[in-house]
Amino acid sequence: MYKRQREGAKGQEFNGFWTNGVNHATDLPFTRMLSGPMDYTPGVFQLNNFRYDSPETKNIDEGAIVPSTIGKELALYVVYYSPMQMAADLPKHYSKHMDAFAFIKNVPVDWSQRKILNSKFREYVSMARKDKYSENWYVGGITNENERKLKIDFSFLESGKEYTMKMYLDTQNTHWKDNPMEYQITERVVSSNDNINIYLAPG
C-alpha cells in the first residue's frame, strides 16, 4: 500500500487549543520530518484574535496567538513535505490577503529535488525544492523567536539561465507577537551566481 503522508506531530490545529512553542516549527524538520511526509496544515493567515474566550461570552481571546507570520506560513509549504497539502484558514481570512493566498494556490505539492541551504536545530532552516512537473524552484526559510538574515546561495539553479523570483517576505516591522500579518511581495531576477540575504522576522 502506498502511503502519502501521516500526521504524527503537533500540527497547526493545536494552536487553536493552546499555543505551540514558537520554536516548534523549527524542531519538526529535524525530528518528525525525518520519518517521511507530514500533515501539518499550514497556511493560517489570521494569527491573532481568532477565537472566543468561551462559547457563552464570545469575547475575543486576546491571548490566543499563533506563533508565526504570514511569510512563515507560506514558507512552511516548501519546508514541510506533504503531497496532500491544506489551506488551513477560513475563506474570509484569505480574502483579506489574496496576493499572499496566490502562493498557496500555485505552490506544488510534489518535488523532484531538495537542497538544504541553511539549518540549525531549533533555530532555523531554509531549503529549495524543484517542482516535479516543471523547471520551477521554490525556496522557503523559517526561524524561531529570533530574527535573522539567512544567506541563500542560488548555485543550485541551472548555470547560464536567469530566473524571475517572486518573494513573499517578512518586513522589518513583522513580529509574531504584535505584527504577524505584515508582509511584502517583491520580484527580482536571479541566477546561479547569486547569493542573497533574506530577512526572517521573529517567529
Model-inferred region functions:
Residues 3-91:
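Glycan-recognition surfaces
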Residues 47-49, 86-88, 95-98, 146-149, ...:
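Flexible loop/turn segments at secondary-structure boundaries
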Residues 92-138, 173-180:
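Glycan-recognition and catalytic regions of carbohydrate-active enzymes
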Residues 1-4, 100:
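Histidine/acidic-residue-rich catalytic or RNA/ligand-binding cores of hydrolases
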Residues 56-63, 81, 86, 90, ...:
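C-terminal accessory segments enriched in acidic
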Residues 121-161:
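Carbohydrate-binding surface patches
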Residues 79, 139, 203:
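Conserved, mostly hydrophobic/aromatic
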Residues 144-202:
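C-terminal beta-sandwich/jelly-roll accessory domains of carbohydrate-active enzymes
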